[in-house]
Amino acid sequence: SGSGGAAGADYIIAQGTTGKWMWRKWASGIAEMWATFDAPSLTMTSQTWGPLYTASWMGLEVNKQAREYPFAFIENPIVSATPTVGSGNIWLATNTENDIGTRLTHAPAYQCVRGSDAIVDSPQISYYVVGRYK
């Protein structure tokens, strides 16, 4: 086979950085974008969800605004969110009280959850979003 790629291969028609988001638009109508949201630390010392400890920085206005996508999708995109921390184990749960916009225009908010109290060091939520923009 040749080095020119397969017939009908998709290709990037635009890419850039908007706020926290890096993004690519593909000729086929698919778009992908990714961003990270972090905090220096997160205090999780109160049981806020039954026996579980939860906390989030997604309610901060700066984070609400930054979760707006650089452009809207035309159908609900696939959103992957991955937590990482400097120390203190967590998992993620939805945080709908801090959602704004729609699934087409904004990344969803998440909260950090754990089974015991802690101050979590350097929590970060990394988003990867893919869907149709046209």
Q: What is the predicted function of each stretch?
A:
Residues 1-42:
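Glycine-rich, low-complexity segments
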